[in-house]
UniProtKB/Swiss-Prot annotation:
InterPro entries: DA_C (IPR054499). Disulfide bonds: none annotated. GO terms for molecular function: isomerase activity. This is Hexane cyclase gkaB.
């Protein structure tokens, strides 16, 4: 079975071709290639598609370490992984982008290697672009005081990012047959840790980087202005301005071992920026872990990992909403959410309604979770966000994105064989198959 699936995955690999050339409206311009100005002060990690480090490697748990820098060095081993994530949506909410750079050995089972790019785009006409790509090599460079830069590349395609060390600007560039262009994020908020406190880089406080057992989380750019300028395979050009941010995740085990599902939100409404993660642990079975950030005009109002009502500590309250127009195809039929931030010390409460507008990614995950639930999978939406401080004279409106999923506990061999066979029917089925399985081990 293993040999069959690995062979099938190789046959299903997506072939990429020529590049597009198009002048860009994004400023400042993103670098097409990695900077060549590194020196002896820089940390450099280069990895081939199938490389894993033999033995124990350096795995960062310190809250003092730079959020964008390498968390695993000199390279991932057979169990741990890390990723850099960037996202944004347009002012209208009709367009969005989610781009994830991963070093992750959990899908090497399929012969595709360890270097994954996930690229999901919502288009104004309601269509979407879903790219799952595996690259031949990646290089990540961190030069203290200057930048972190990364490139995932093969002979005929590449994806790169560069983040200033003050984490105020991220520049992304991508060249492939599917999409060619640039995406920039300019922060108007301060970087934060999993416990909701702001990152200073000066002290190591135990446990504040860990979102749930085994999973570490940080928010280099909670919110900021984004610019997208890209040309699609069809020749269509996608240009928009809006808001978005970036997230860092690194972990000691694969997703299915760590959690049964999650929901995450990034959005804005008027002067407010909201970021929220909710995760159901499988290490501590069924325990819910949360983290939330609320900014106004770039200043942190509430930062907390407390998801329970309290008379003394700041907390969040998250609730799914139903009855709207846009929902996923799976058991989770929610059409949005309500997210509250409460601060007993400030004697204030803020409430935001988050309504799904448009789907940017969706796929089904066959199987059951540990509670016998079926209809599992992952969905992503652009959102309409409205709200503000409870008791204020006005409510603000903005946009954002949601990603939500529920994972099966395991996939039987028959289900995997069916999914593998489905890949022969086209790139969309192939993408669904490999994407789902990439989280299994």
């Amino acid at each position: 079975m293993t040999k069959f699936l690995a062979g099938a995955a190789i046959v299903l690999a997506v072939a990429f071709g020529s590049f597009f050339s198009q002048s860009s409206t994004v400023t400042p311009p993103a670098p097409r290639y990695l900077p060549n100005d590194w020196d002896s002060t820089c940390t450099i990690s280069k990895s081939g598609a199938y490389e894993v480090y033999s033995g124990d490697n350096s795995f960062s748990t310190s809250s003092a370490d730079h959020l964008s820098a390498l968390k695993i060095h000199p390279n991932i081993n057979s169990t741990n992984w890390e990723q850099w994530e960037f996202d944004g949506s347009s002012q209208t909410g009709l367009s969005s982008v989610l781009l994830v750079f991963s070093r992750d050995p959990s899908y090497s089972f399929f012969g595709q290697g360890n270097l994954r790019i996930e690229f999901y785009i919502a288009l104004p006409d309601g269509k979407r672009v879903e790219v799952l790509d595996y690259l031949e090599e990646s290089t990540v460079v961190h030069c203290p005081g200057r930048y972190t830069a990364g490139m995932w590349n093969s002979t005929d395609r590449s994806y790169s990012f560069r983040i200033d060390d003050n984490m105020k600007n991220a520049q992304l560039s991508f060249d492939s047959a599917k999409i060619h262009g640039k995406f920039n994020v300019t922060s108007d908020t301060s970087s934060a840790l999993a416990d909701g406190t702001l990152w200073t880089g000066k002290d190591d406080r135990k446990g504040v980087s860990e979102l749930s057992p085994g999973l570490f989380y940080a928010v280099p750019i909670p919110g900021g202005f984004v610019q997208m300028d890209a040309t699609l395979e069809s020749g269509k050009r996608l240009v928009f301005k809006g808001k978005g941010g970036s997230t860092r995740l690194w972990a000691k085990a694969g997703w299915l071992n760590l959690c049964g599902g999650w929901k995450n939100i990034r959005g804005w409404a008027g002067p407010y920026t909201v970021v929220y993660w909710e995760l159901i642990s499988r290490i501590n079975k069924g325990v819910k872990y949360t983290t939330g950030l609320l900014f106004r005009d770039g200043e942190l109002l509430v930062g907390t990992r407390n998801g329970n009502i309290s008379q003394t500590e700041d907390y969040t309250v998250f609730e799914d909403l139903y009855g709207g127009e846009v929902k996923g195809s799976f058991a989770d039929q929610s059409t949005g959410h309500n997210l509250k931030f409460v601060s007993p010390d400030q004697e204030k409460e803020w409430s935001f309604d988050i309504e799904h507008m448009h789907s940017f990614v969706e796929f089904r995950a066959p199987g059951e979770d540990e509670y016998g639930n079926k209809g599992l999978g992952q969905s992503g939406f652009t959102n309409r966000v409205s709200g503000g401080e409870v008791g204020e004279d006005r409510a603000y409106e903005g946009r954002g994105i949601t990603e939500k999923c529920r994972w099966p506990k395991e996939f039987g061999k028959l289900a995997l064989a069916i999914a593998s066979g489905a890949g022969f029917f086209g790139p969309k089925f192939q993408m669904i198959f490999i994407k789902v399985v990439s989280y299994l081990v």
